[in-house]
């Protein structure tokens, strides 16, 4: 019995989490490269 109804699928959570993590890392490295993240 797959209870995916009314519940967010696990693959969707993993995909969104991966995109957010990659986005944050990209923003962090971009900020460090452009000098904005040097104060962090």
Curated annotation (Swiss-Prot):
Keywords associated with the record: Chloroplast, Membrane, Photosynthesis, Photosystem II, Plastid, Reaction center, Thylakoid, Transmembrane, Transmembrane helix
Transmembrane regions listed in the UniProt entry: 8-28
GO biological process: photosynthesis
GO CC, alphabetical: chloroplast thylakoid membrane; photosystem II reaction center
InterPro entries, sorted: PSII_PsbJ (IPR002682), PSII_PsbJ_sf (IPR037267)
Entry membrane topology: Single-pass membrane protein
Keyword Ubl conjugation in record: no
Matches recorded under Pfam families: PsbJ
Subcellular location: Plastid, Chloroplast thylakoid membrane
Main location class: plastid
Taxonomic superkingdom: Eukaryota
Family: Belongs to the PsbJ family.
Descriptive protein name: Photosystem II reaction center protein J
Originating species: Piper cenocladum
Name of the gene encoding the protein in the UniProt record: psbJ
